[in-house]
Structure formats: C-alpha cells, structure tokens
C-alpha cells in the first residue's frame, strides 16, 4: 500500500489496536524510532509536540483516538462578556480565595472551571490581579489593557483551534494539519 493508512478510533467505545505503540501525552512518550504504526491516544495542550513527532518520522498507519484532557474547544477561549463579568464580580471583593471558591465562582458566572482558571491567569498576566498563596487580589490601579495582549490568551485561542481540528476534523485533515510546517 502506498502512502499512509489513517484510522478513526475517536468513538468512546473504540478499542486501541494491540501491539502498536501508543502516544499518550499524560505519561511517558514511547520511542517510535522503529515503529511503522502509531496510536494517537491523547492530544497535548501544545500541539507542536505532536507535529514534531509526525514530521520527524514516516508512519504507514496512524490510529487517531485523540482524547483531550482539557477540552477547551468546548469552552472556547472566553468572550468579551465573560471577561467583563468576571472582572465586575471579582472587583467587588478585595480578596478572593480561589483555592476554595473557584468552583462557586465558576457556577455563579456560568463559566466552565478549566476556562475560568485560564481567564484568571490572563488577568494575572495583564496585572489586573495578583495571586499569593491562593488568594487573588484585584489591582484597582491597573492600567486598561486589551485581553488580546496576553500571551496566555493567544495560546488558548490557538489551543482551541488546534483541538477543534483534532476533535472534529476528518482523519485526512488531521494528518495534513500535523504534517504542515509552521
């Protein structure tokens, strides 16, 4: 067979094929130097790790499971309204213990917790808040800045785009995407 065979095993009940090395970025990455085939079990938050593997080595068969630990493609990267609502809410509290109150805040704002954590990291990066020992304090003197100035925000936007491709693209689109040079 010429080229590469691509298999979609993204379904919940799909079983991993036996005897084929498994790329699981939540653990140790296997040595693939002599492998003709590979199973992509999990997707790293930084897709360049996966791209590097694919561009370095030619596989004749690829099985895409594509489990995503933190599904930012489902939460999005935070709308202007969500950021505004978060700011208005935390502005009312001089100190906010995010170790114990994060879940309540997520529920109150109706924002998934994984996204809320990123949004708070963006605020911290931009100097809107400081976090010390799990306590978040609003910097009321912070100069006005655009959310887009944040590197964390830019990375999150890219992660959402990459995850959408890995979760929703066809196996051919995914393979082509992984083979694209940056």
Report each predicted region and the residues it spans.
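Short, amphipathic alpha-helical interaction segments positioned at domain boundaries
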Residues: 142-182
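A short, well-structured beta->alpha microelement
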Residues: 2-34
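Minor-groove-contacting beta-hairpin "wing" of winged helix-turn-helix DNA-binding domains
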Residues: 135-141
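A short, conserved structural fragment
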Residues: 124-135
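Short amphipathic alpha-helical interface segments
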Residues: 77-103, 107
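Structural alpha-beta junctions
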Residues: 2-6, 33-34, 52-63, 110
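Long, low-complexity, charged/polar intrinsically disordered regions in eukaryotic proteins
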Residues: 39-76
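Short amphipathic alpha-helical interaction segments
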Residues: 110-125
């Amino acid at each position: 067979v010429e080229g590469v065979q691509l298999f979609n095993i993204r379904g919940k009940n799909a079983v991993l094929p036996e005897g084929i090395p498994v790329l699981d970025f939540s653990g140790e990455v296997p040595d693939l130097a002599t492998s003709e085939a590979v199973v992509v079990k999990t997707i790293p938050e930084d897709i360049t790790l996966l791209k590097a593997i694919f561009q370095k080595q030619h596989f004749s068969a690829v099985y895409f499971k594509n489990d995503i630990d933190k599904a930012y493609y489902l939460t999005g990267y935070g709308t202007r309204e969500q950021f505004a609502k978060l700011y208005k809410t935390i502005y009312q509290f001089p100190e906010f213990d995010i170790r114990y109150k994060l879940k309540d805040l997520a529920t109150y704002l109706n924002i998934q917790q994984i996204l809320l954590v990123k949004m708070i990291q963006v605020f911290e990066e931009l100097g809107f808040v400081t976090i010390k020992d799990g306590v978040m304090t609003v910097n009321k003197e912070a100069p006005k800045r655009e959310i887009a100035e944040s590197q964390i925000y830019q990375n999150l936007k890219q992660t959402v785009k990459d995850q959408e491709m890995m979760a929703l693209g066809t196996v051919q689109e995914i393979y082509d995407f992984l083979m694209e040079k940056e």
